[in-house]
């Protein structure tokens, strides 16, 4: 029998590792996921499963990836990118988990309402008596206004938006690449208020789309915590709302409404629109999907 070198197909090994992590996320840690659970997705016996895990088996046939996509309820385009080596493990897991909430709806809203009425003093200041709707208002128009002011200040007119150029507008906000990081980003702060300095280190020398999103989120938090004039019109809010606002800000900054409208007119409708736009704006397909839904609902 011909002996196949271990890790001959490293992207297949990454795909295996991702599938195992995705199953673990699905079961929320309540079920111990073993290697054979991953192999079972494709009906593999223990030997084939082991070969896949060790990168001895090349998994990239479209029909096979579709089977995995159906089992994990995931966009097959992400699996195709993993199998082709375009997306690494950390980025794939981030994509699978999603980019977080961009609005306060459904179960999240209901849970916050219960907590608010059970313990209102946790959210209300001494002289503040705001309603739930006022206190937990995402205030999208104000976030849009902040993004528009930054885009105008930097005179950005063409996609993609370069984060290093945006950082030039804010000398106290610094981005640094760091190959030694084990997490996607690491944030360090110094000082407070107008003197606040923030350094965001990101993993690797190449700022991948998901890292751009995470850095943009940190920029919003910096603007809020340093009382920047760009966000002076935005009312303070609970941490739960700040997190959603940061997601919304990042999406709007990386894919500004005016630029998106312009680029949508250029795309080839006979091909995958999401893929085309994600490549233009240097964002992931998942974020572009979210941003397009947001754009269609709000027209900006």
What are these regions (language model features)?
Residues 1-37:
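A short, Lys/Arg-rich alpha-helix, primarily the initiator
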Residues 3-4, 81-130, 184-188:
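Short, charged recognition helix plus adjacent turn
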Residues 43-60, 81-85:
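Recognition helix of helix-turn-helix/homeodomain-like DNA-binding domains
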């Amino acid at each position: 029998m011909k002996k196949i070198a271990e890790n001959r197909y490293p992207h297949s090994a990454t795909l295996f590792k991702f599938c195992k992590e995705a199953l673990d996320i699905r079961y929320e840690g309540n079920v111990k996921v073993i290697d054979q659970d991953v192999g079972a997705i494709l009906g593999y016996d223990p030997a084939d499963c082991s070969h896949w895990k060790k990168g001895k088996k090349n998994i990239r046939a479209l029909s096979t990836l579709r089977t995995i996509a159906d089992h994990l309820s995931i966009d097959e385009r992400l699996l195709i990118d993993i199998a082709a080596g375009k997306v690494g493990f950390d980025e794939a897991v981030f994509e699978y988990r999603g980019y977080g909430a961009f609005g306060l709806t459904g179960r999240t809203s209901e849970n916050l309402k219960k907590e608010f009425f059970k313990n209102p003093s946790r959210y209300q200041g001494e002289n503040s008596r705001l309603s739930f709707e006022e206190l937990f208002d995402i205030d999208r128009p104000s976030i849009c206004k902040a993004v528009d002011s930054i885009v105008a200040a930097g005179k950005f007119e063409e996609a993609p938006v370069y984060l290093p150029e945006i950082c030039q507008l804010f000398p106290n906000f610094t981005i640094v690449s760091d190959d030694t990081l084990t997490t996607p980003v690491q944030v360090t702060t110094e000082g407070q208020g107008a003197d606040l300095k923030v350094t965001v280190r990101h993993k690797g020398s190449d700022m991948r789309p998901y890292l751009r999103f995470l850095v943009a989120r940190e920029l919003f938090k910096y603007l809020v915590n340093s009382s920047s004039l760009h966000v002076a019109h935005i009312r303070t809010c609970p941490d739960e709302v700040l997190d959603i606002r940061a997601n919304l800000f990042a999406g709007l900054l990386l894919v500004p409404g005016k630029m998106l409208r312009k680029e949508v007119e250029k795309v080839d409708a006979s091909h995958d629109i999401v893929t085309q736009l994600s490549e233009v704006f240097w964002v992931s397909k998942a974020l572009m999907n979210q941003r397009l839904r947001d754009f269609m609902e709000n027209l900006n």
